[in-house]
């Protein structure tokens, strides 16, 4: 995809970003990890509060949320890569965001999913089926599917 280089992606369920201390710690963590792309789940930010997702060196921030402090997903793309945005598709409930673009003239699609607590597998299956035409070999899907691996993980 990127000639002579690589693309690094980190993903994190942050369980809310309304506290200034938590936003500062996230900023420091992203700077330390130094990824190309950072995907966040459970931002808990209202639509009008997305400005709180600012991280130095990260001007491309895509966010999907609702007007309640729950759910919310974000895709942050570092300024160190030349990402050209072509399209963004947001879920109004804040459960997924899809960003289509290109890096060094190579198309890429990034989908970040935060599945609802109830009916997560069915939700993800429906969502991916509805996006079938959008998904190809250059699609990266990151997520918090909210599904236990075994019955022991339910509680």
Predicted regions and their residues:
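A shared catalytic/ligand-binding motif for oxyanion handling
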Residues: 1-155
């Amino acid at each position: 995809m990127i000639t002579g280089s690589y693309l690094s992606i980190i993903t994190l369920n942050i369980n809310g970003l309304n506290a200034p201390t938590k936003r500062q710690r996230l900023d420091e963590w992203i700077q330390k990890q130094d990824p190309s792309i950072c995907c966040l789940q459970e931002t808990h930010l209202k639509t009008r509060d997305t400005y709180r997702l600012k991280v130095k060196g990260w001007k491309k921030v895509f966010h999907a949320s609702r007007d309640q402090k729950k759910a919310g997903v974000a895709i942050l793309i570092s300024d160190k890569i030349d990402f050209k945005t072509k399209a963004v598709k947001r879920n109004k409930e804040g459960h997924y965001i899809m960003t289509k673009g290109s890096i060094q003239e190579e198309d890429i699609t990034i989908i970040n999913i935060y599945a609802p607590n109830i009916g997560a597998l069915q939700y993800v299956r429906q969502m991916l089926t509805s996006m079938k035409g959008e998904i190809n070999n250059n699609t990266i899907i990151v997520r918090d599917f909210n599904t236990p691996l075994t019955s022991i993980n339910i509680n």
